[in-house]
Design a protein with these regions (language model features):
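A short, well-ordered alpha-helical element
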Residues: 49, 77-100, 345-369
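N-terminal short beta-loop-beta anion/metal-coordinating cradle
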Residues: 43-60, 309-324
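Glycine/small-residue-rich phosphate/adenosyl-binding loop
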Residues: 92-106, 129, 133-137, 371-374, ...
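STAS-typified acidic loop motif
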Residues: 58-83, 322-353
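Structural motif
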Residues: 65, 103-107, 142-144, 166, ...
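Conserved catalytic cores of soluble enzyme domains
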Residues: 112-241, 387-506
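Amphipathic alpha-helical segments at domain termini/boundaries
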Residues: 1-29, 33, 183-309, 462-560
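Short, glycine-/small-residue-enriched flexible loop/hinge segments at domain edges that mediate gating
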Residues: 99-117, 371-392
Length: 560
């Protein structure tokens, strides 16, 4: 009888995969790296914070295996747990850059962001994704989703960034959990009590049909290990996060104004071949094309008068308003959009894939230039799209394409400067903003930065909204306002004096000056990664203290 992989705990899964006796756990339970943010909320922590990291070999190939414990906080990512993954992948990247091949294997059993640490989770997931994009230049990054919790939220965006994804039939993979979709969009959009609907939409068998999972294996340690070995030896890579034209040309053929039948989608997908898709065109018009904070700031930072895009929700344009010629990007609402779940500015399928297409075009244009153009990201995104069609097709893949394209540009030498002028929420922020080299934010009460709406967070964490608000007074990372967000060290520049979102002459001048400073800082430091987020003064002294403690521990133990 073969040994079940699904039934094992995270540490057992890691040990089962590694060659005996090569496994060596790093920053383990005896290091007592617990999550102080959980303790502050009266939540019992774990001494390993639900993440197991071990170095060793699999079939004599050097690996670092990272596994999430789904039974602790739903496998959610907070500051300490995220920092362990970031530190391990950082070392793996350095090893590969130095010619020492080491394969990252990531076992996902996670609901995504740990809502009790919210913004720490979003920051960590963006930094993990950045490292995966960098690592794939050297080795395949292999993901495994055994089952139990499955893979949801921002970590599903991460799964789509990986080279190759292996699951058992007990796994589910999606961005928005069924309960969250029901909370945000209503039971008619997705009935979270309908188990057949859930498994037929996001279950592993359907995910293979939908080309979201690469390999489905029968549940056993031996089968999972064999699939991992084959992926390493054959250097398998589905390039799922570099597939914008494929999906854009597919979406153009589908009627997404109503829920699609699963079989109809599978047939359309199976028949589809990639076709070239024209880039959006942005022109000036006599009247505004839409109304939003992001639209106003795009107009102000490009100098375009009443810009209108052939893709109504996705905008980009050249700008000479900064110290260097730049490209400005944004995502805006369209109240008449046939894809009804993105009418208020949410980031959906088209938005993710279109932004990736635009960014990849910029990458190609500047590939042979010594100096790469800055990208100025105007951030005003209320959330990702919560919808049945979005989950069926794989909205997390769309968001991964956008995130990967931003990361690719930054790693190639483009300063990517994010300007938070409106809301910056959840997967939308991961796709459009959190891969920025530097973040700048207005000091406006109207800005919300978070992983989930209060209503959904209340339902998932089983706490009242009043309890969530009370906890936020102790733990800045779960607050919803931009001033608490600034305490985390994530912002390069917090514009105290810009207390409203309007594009007055003074406000625009202040933002342009801050963007110019950020571009200069990136150029001066030759910074192509995201380490500035946790090495700046605010982060070191207050915002990312635990992140830096984990980094020190990992440095001590990596080669010990």
């Amino acid at each position: 009888m073969k040994n079940s992989f699904v039934e094992l705990k995270a540490r057992e899964r890691v040990n089962a995969l590694l060659d005996t006796p090569t496994g060596r756990e790093l920053v383990g339970p005896f290091d007592q790296m617990t999550a102080p943010n959980l303790i502050a909320q009266g939540i019992v922590p774990e001494s390993d914070d639900g993440i197991i990291v071990s170095r060793g070999t699999i079939c004599n190939k050097e690996v670092v295996v990272i596994a999430m414990e789904g039974s602790f906080q739903g496998g959610g990512i907070g500051e300490v747990s995220g920092a362990k993954i970031i530190a391990a992948l950082t070392h793996a990247l350095t090893e590969n850059q130095n010619g020492n091949e080491i394969f990252p294997i990531i076992v996902l059993d996670t609901g995504g962001v740990r809502l009790q640490e919210a913004n720490y989770g979003l920051l960590s997931i963006s930094e993990i994704g950045n490292l995966i994009v960098a690592l794939k230049k050297y080795v395949p990054v292999i993901g495994v989703v055994p089952g139990r919790v499955g893979s949801f939220g921002g970590m599903s965006i991460t799964s789509a960034l990986m080279s190759y994804l292996i699951t058992t039939k007990k796994a589910r993979v999606g961005l928005n959990g069924p309960e969250v979709i029901e909370q945000e969009a209503g039971v008619r959009e997705f009935d979270s009590s309908d188990k057949d609907l859930i498994w037929n939409t996001i279950g592993a068998r359907q995910r293979v049909e939908a080309q979201i999972i690469d390999e489905l294996v029968t549940d056993s340690v031996e089968n999972v290990k064999a699939a991992i070995v084959a992926a390493m030896v054959e250097r398998k890579d589905s390039h799922r996060s570099e597939n914008a034209d494929f999906y854009l040309s597919l979406l153009a053929k589908l009627d997404l104004s109503k829920p699609m039948a699963i079989e109809d989608y599978n047939q359309a997908l199976a028949k589809h071949q990639t076709q070239a898709v024209e880039l959006p065109v942005v022109t000036e018009q006599a009247t505004p094309a839409t109304a939003s904070v992001g639209y106003d700031w795009f107009q102000a930072l490009t100098g375009l008068k009443n810009p209108s895009s052939t893709i109504s929700t996705v905008y980009y344009g050249d700008s000479d308003r900064f110290s260097e010629d730049a490209v400005v990007t944004t995502i805006v609402p369209d109240s008449k959009n046939p894809m009804y779940r993105v009418r208020d500015g949410e980031v959906g399928l088209v938005e993710g894939f279109r932004m990736a297409q635009i960014l990849n075009h910029i990458y190609e244009e500047d590939q042979n230039k010594t100096v790469k153009r800055p990208i100025v990201v105007v951030i005003d995104v209320p959330s990702q799209a919560y919808g049945y069609n979005e989950e069926l097709i794989g909205i997390h893949v769309a968001l991964a394409n956008s995130a990967a394209a931003y990361a690719k540009l930054r790693q190639a030498g483009h300063p990517v400067i994010g300007v938070v002028v409106g809301n910056a929420i959840s997967g939308a922020f991961l796709a459009h903003g959190l891969q920025s080299s530097r973040l700048i934010a207005l000091n406006s009460d109207a800005i919300t930065v978070q992983a989930m709406s209060k209503a959904s967070a209340s339902r998932i964490t089983k706490r009242s909204i009043a309890e969530i608000e009370a906890a936020a007074e102790k733990v800045p990372s779960i607050a919803y306002d931009i001033r608490n967000y600034n305490k985390l060290g994530a912002l390069y520049r917090f514009l105290d004096g810009v207390t409203d979102q309007t594009t007055t002459t003074d406000n625009v001048a202040t933002v342009i000056e801050a963007v110019n400073d950020a571009i200069e800082d990136v150029r001066h430091t030759s910074d192509t990664m995201l380490t500035n987020r946790y090495t700046n003064d605010i982060a070191v002294k207050m915002g990312r203290v635990e992140t830096n403690k984990v980094q020190v521990k990992m440095n001590e133990e990596w080669d010990a």
